[in-house]
A protein has these predicted regions:
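N-terminal beta-strand motif that seeds the catalytic metal site of vicinal oxygen chelate
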Residues: 1-21, 77-84, 134-153
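A low-complexity, Ser/Thr/Gly/Pro-enriched, surface-exposed linker/loop concept
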Residues: 62-66
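Regulatory and interaction patches adjacent to catalytic/ligand-binding sites
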Residues: 71
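Vicinal oxygen chelate
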Residues: 1, 14-29, 36, 43-50, 55, 74-153
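Short, structured motif recognition centered on aromatic/hydrophobic residues
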Residues: 7-14, 23-24, 47, 52-58, ...
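Amide-forming acyltransferase catalytic core, primarily the GNAT-like/NAT-type
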Residues: 5, 33-39, 44, 97
């Protein structure tokens, strides 16, 4: 069975959110979230473009070692990941794994569940699979979820 999926957002690794933000503002983007994640060593800002497009800027926290510092050192700023919202992450993972696609790093976080399809499985692109839980909308509001509702609702 084909999983219920839609593009949620594109994540862009930057040295500085402040340096990346002016272009987004010129294009009419509205910042929905700006949050620091000390546990993972990065700050992220989430933007809405139109009513169905989202971009995320990811900036490393100074002095913190994280996935993002390694990424920026190896590749420089640019596309980090494409996030696909899924209605059922476990079902989606099962479908992919049955077809031989490797899925890694399944994690339950506050507000969402996530897993990743590594670039080696997806033409060089890191795909984040994300299933929102109720807490995400409570914390960040309906605009943080495309169309104000989670996929499959």
């Amino acid at each position: 069975m084909t999983p219920l999926v839609r593009v949620d957002h594109i994540g862009i690794a930057v040295e500085s959110i402040a340096d990346g933000e002016p272009l987004l503002e010129l294009l009419g983007a509205e910042k929905l979230v700006h949050k620091r994640d000390d546990d993972q060593g990065f700050t992220w800002a989430y933007y809405e473009l139109g009513n169905a497009s989202r971009l995320e800027l990811l900036e490393p926290i100074d002095g913190a070692e994280s996935f993002l510092t390694g990424f920026l050192e190896a590749r420089g700023p640019g596309l980090h990941h494409v996030t696909l919202e899924v209605a059922d992450i476990e079902g989606t993972m099962a479908v992919l794994e049955e077809e031989g696609v490797r899925v890694i790093d399944y994690t339950e976080r506050d507000g969402y569940l996530e897993a990743f399809v590594p670039p080696s499985e997806a033409a060089g692109v890191l795909f984040q699979l994300m299933e929102y839980t109720g807490d995400f909308q409570v914390e960040f509001g309906d605009k943080a979820v495309i169309g104000g509702s989670r996929l499959g609702e």
